[in-house]
C-alpha cells in the first residue's frame, strides 16, 4: 500500500522502479561482475563503421574502451560521489578526491583502479544490497533509455561527460532514496 501511494505521489518511472525493487527484495541476487570486455566487440564494430580498423591507433582503442565502459563508469562515479566505495579503494583516496572534484572522470578511475570492471568488492556493505537489486535490473534500462537517442546519433554510447553524469546521477539518487524510504534499505 505504501509503495502504491508513493508511486502515485512520485508519478515517475523511478517510482515504479523502486516499487518493483522493493517488491522483489527476496529476488535480490549477488552482484555479478560487469566489465567493459562484455561490450568491447560491439563498440569496436560500431566504431569501425566510422573509421577503417586498419587505421586504428592506440587512441582509437582507448576511445572504444571508453564507449564500452561508459555505463559502468557513470555508476562508479555515483558510488564514489556518495562515499559508497568498498575498502579496496581506500588506497586510491587521492584519485577518489579527484573524481569528487571532477578532475578525474569515472572512466579514468575505472581504467586505473578497476581494470574496466565492477565487482561486489567495489561497493561498501551499506550500498551493496541496493546495487544487487538495482544495477542489472533497472539501472541499465534507465541508462539506455536516457542516452539511447544520443547513442543512436553517434552509433555508440556517448563518451563520459559530467553533464551526462549529472543526468543519470539524479536518477540513481532518486532510486536509492525511494528504495531506502520503502524499507528495502534498512
Q: Model-found features: residue ranges?
A:
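N-terminal low-complexity, intrinsically disordered segments
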Residues: 15-104
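Amphipathic protein-protein interaction modules
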Residues: 99-167, 171
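Residue-level detector of alpha-helical secondary structure
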Residues: 169, 173-176, 180
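Feature marks short, highly hydrophobic, charge-poor N-terminal signal-anchor/signal peptide-like helices
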Residues: 1-9
